[in-house]
Regions:
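Non-catalytic, solvent-exposed segments at the cell envelope interface
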Residues: 2-8, 25-42, 46-327
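Alpha-helical transmembrane segments
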Residues: 10-23
C-alpha cells in the first residue's frame, strides 16, 4: 500500500475543525421573522447532527491495541501543550484494518500545537535497518517490521531516528480509495510524468504537474515504484504529495456536505491509539486560535542495493541502504 488518508489522524482532525465551525452559528433574534427562526433552528440541528457523527466516529476509531507501557506513554501526552509524533502506517491489504501485514507506508507526523506546524518524514519501505526485539541486530526491510505488529514498526523507527513516537494510525488500501472518492477526488502535483503498471492496481497515465485522481488512481500513483528512476525514494515523495492533496481538499467548504460520510468511512478503516479526548483537545486548540497549519514534507534517502534480509530466506532482496540524508 502506499499511503492513506493522510495522515489519517491529521486529515480527520482538520476535517473535524471544519465540521466544528458549523456549530458556531450566531444566534440572532428577529421579531416577526418566524421563517428565519425556523431556518436557524434547522441549521443548528444540522450542525448538532454533524457533531454527533464526529463524536461517534471518534469513539469507533480509537480502538487500537498495544502494550500497556505504550498505552501509558500515549495517555500522558498533552496534545495541546507539547509537540508529539504520530506514526502513520499504511498496510498492503484491502478490507479489515485489524489484519497484520507489511507496512508499506511509513510516515512520522510530528505536530507542534503551539506553532501549528506539522512535519511529515517519510521512510522508504525498503529501508535496510535492524528490527528491535526481532532480528538480533541483523538488518531487514522496514516493511517487514509490520508483520510483527504495529509496536515493532514503531520501535524500529524510534531506534532509527532516536525519537519517541507515542501515537500511531493504521490505514490500508481501502482507507485511501474510499476517503479520496468521498472527497470527490484530489488534485495531486506530480514531480514526474510516468505510467503506473498493473501491479500498482491499475494503469494510470501520470503527467508532470497537476493531476486529478479518484481513489483507485491515487492508490496506483502511490504504489508505483518500478516505473520511477529513484524507485522507492520517489514513491515516498509521491505518497506525501497525496497526503498534502487530501489535507487541502479536506479543508475546503465542500467537505461539509460530505461530512457524515467521510467521518463514517474514517471510523471503519482507521485504527489509532490516540484517545477521543486527545483528538477533541486538538479541535479545541484550533477553535481557540483559528490559525492555519503549515505542513512541511521531507523524505529519508539512501542507496539502492541487493542484500539478504532477516525475515526472508529465499535469497537477497532489493533494499535501500540509509545514507543519513533527509531531504
Amino acid at each position: 500500500m502506499d499511503i492513506s488518508g493522510g495522515a489519517a489522524v491529521v486529515l480527520l482532525v482538520l476535517a473535524l475543525l471544519i465540521f466544528s465551525d458549523a456549530e458556531r452559528i450566531p444566534e440572532k433574534e428577529v421579531p416577526g421573522r418566524s421563517i428565519l427562526g425556523l431556518l436557524i433552528s434547522a441549521l443548528l440541528l444540522l450542525a448538532s447532527y454533524y457533531m454527533f457523527e464526529v463524536r461517534t466516529a471518534l469513539n469507533d476509531i480509537t480502538d487500537g491495541n498495544e502494550a500497556p507501557e505504550r498505552k501509558e506513554a500515549a495517555a500522558a501526552v498533552n496534545v495541546s501543550e507539547e509537540p508529539f509524533s504520530v506514526y502513520i502506517s499504511g498496510i498492503d491489504v484491502y478490507g479489515d484494518i485489524t489484519q497484520q501485514s507489511r507496512s508499506d507506508v511509513n510516515i512520522i507526523a510530528t505536530v507542534n500545537p503551539k506553532t501549528k506546524q506539522i512535519l511529515l518524514v517519510t521512510t522508504p519501505r525498503d529501508y535496510y535497518v535492524p528490527i528491535p526485539g526481532v532480528s538480533n541486530g541483523a538488518p531487514d526491510k522496514l516493511t517487514h517490521a509490520g508483520t510483527y505488529g504495529i509496536a515493532t514498526s514503531m520501535a524500529t523507527l524510534e531506534e532509527l531516528y532516536q525519537v519517541d513516537i507515542p501515537f500511531y494510525v493504521r490505514v490500508n488500501f481501502t482507507s485511501l480509495i474510499e476517503m479520496v472518492d468521498i472527497l470527490g477526488g484530489i488534485d495531486v502535483d506530480s514531480e514526474l510524468a510516468f505510467t503506473t503498471g498493473n501491479d500498482s492496481g491499475m494503469v494510470v497515465e501520470v503527467k508532470e504537474g497537476l493531476n486529478h485522481f479518484n481513489g483507485k488512481e491515487a492508490l496506483a500513483f502511490c504504489r508505483e515504484r518500478h516505473a520511477l528512476a529513484e524507485g522507492d525514494n520517489q514513491r515516498g515523495k509521491n505518497q506525501q504529495a497525496v497526503i498534502e492533496a487530501m489535507l487541502k481538499k479536506a479543508m475546503s467548504p465542500s467537505i461539509l456536505i460530505k461530512g457524515p460520510r467521510l467521518i463514517d468511512q474514517v471510523s471503519g478503516n482507521t485504527e489509532t491509539n490516540m484517545s477521543t479526548s486527545q483528538l477533541q483537545e486538538l479541535v479545541r486548540v484550533q477553535l481557540a486560535g483559528m490559525k492555519g497549519w503549515n505542513v512541511i514534507s521531507v523524505a529519508a534517502e539512501g542507496t539502492s542495493s541487493t542484500q539478504y534480509c532477516y525475515s526472508y530466506s529465499g535469497g537477497p532482496l532489493s533494499v535501500i541502504v540509509p545514507d543519513g540524508h533527509i531531504g
